[in-house]
Amino acid sequence: MATHEEFIRTQVFGTVFEITNRYTDLNPVGMGAFGLVCSATDTLAGQPVAIKKIMKPFSTAVLAKRTYRELKLLKHLRHENLICLQDIFLSPLEDIYFVTELQGTDLHRLLQTRPLEKQFVQYFLYQILRGLKYVHSAGVIHRDLKPSNILINENCDLKICDFGLARIQDPQMTGYVSTRYYRAPEIMLTWQKYDVEVDIWSAGCIFSEMIEGKPLFPGKDHVHQFSIITDLLGSPPRDVINTICSENTLKFVTSLPHRDPVPFQERFKTVEPDAVDLLERMLVFDPKKRITAADALVHPYLAPYHDPTDEPTAEAQFDWDFNDADLPVDTWRVMMYSEILDFHKIGGGDGQIDTNAAFDDQVAAATAAAAHAAAMAQHHHQTQQQSSGKHTNPTTSSSAATHNSNGPHSNHDAIANYGNQAVHYANEFQQ
């Protein structure tokens, strides 16, 4: 049965941190748009950890879905060069806390303190690409790769973090996802269609920054960003221009004067040829001609570290069935509870659940709300089917419900199915 641990409330940068007494010595180490990160000591394991508080995860359905996606990804992606989830818990105030290993610093801070020697540039790039090979093999795009999302410890072990923006490899995507300096041109040009190659572009920008100690494309805004990219790469080729979906973007690009590319050997005169060659293969306008993470690992520049027997791929593709579902907050909430339960059941953390009376009340309330949403959605579906003279199965699979955008009632199917699943999962807490 679940263990009961005492929750302790404290203030960090004016933000309430409510964590179990298992974790002590809180110190702030980072702040993002969606959460505050503190270092702490795990008294049970006797080691330092990082604790990320997700701000108001259930305030909107969008934030609830984002938190659910990040949790699912952290559970699924297990690799030496990715941050590892060690524990997760829900506080009485309904805040979500992710506990991971503590890395000490990030690449952004490191680049601000000193220039990197060649062997460190090679080793860090190798680890980034090794992690990306695994991520991409799981059918996942990181979408927000940048120096501050690359964590490094005193042994120079590197881990990619912050998968909150990660998405499925899907032909239809949203545009504004990554920090501007590291944003691939296809995101700016099409805003809709892109794939894993966007991470390779970001890694190439980071590679250049490690070499030179400053960002390669420090755009002041969207237009300036595209302009300085073309200063180096020249005008985008016609086959890339033909993929632009936005009429306004197409008009803007075609109105620009033609620019010839600058040879990379000329732009990076003091850099060794192998490094320049790999960089040039990563920073290509046409994403389909950009080198893959797997191919980059076998490039001569990374020969000192390349080991084909120790560069694994994912055992299974990540399940994105939930990603197109437009569900109520209460349904996302109970689905989140089920993921927390599953994490501890399969041996995450210490294999036990931290729970209390307030938590039990949260589960009960959310279960009732999710059940109501499921019942209402199923009733609406049946009413619509009767009025249209159709008699289809209202318990359409979640996969079909979330991906069949052509059906007018597909989201009601999704709510009904996920709501019923949420009730089933939540009942497990009460056993």
Curated annotation (Swiss-Prot):
Activated by tyrosine and threonine phosphorylation. It is found in: Cytoplasm; Nucleus. Pfam families: Pkinase. It comes from the Eukaryota. Its cofactor is Mg(2+). Signal peptide: none annotated. InterPro entries: Kinase-like_dom_sf (IPR011009), MAP_kinase (IPR050117), MAP_kinase_CS (IPR003527), MAPK_p38-like (IPR008352), MAPK_Sty1/Hog1 (IPR038783), Prot_kinase_dom (IPR000719), Protein_kinase_ATP_BS (IPR017441), Ser/Thr_kinase_AS (IPR008271). GO terms for molecular function: ATP binding; MAP kinase activity; protein serine kinase activity. Proline-directed serine/threonine-protein kinase involved in a signal transduction pathway that is activated by changes in the osmolarity of the extracellular environment. Controls osmotic regulation of transcription of target genes. The TXY motif contains the threonine and tyrosine residues whose phosphorylation activates the MAP kinases. This is Mitogen-activated protein kinase HOG1. It comes from Zygosaccharomyces rouxii (strain ATCC 2623 / CBS 732 / NBRC 1130 / NCYC 568 / NRRL Y-229). The gene is HOG1.
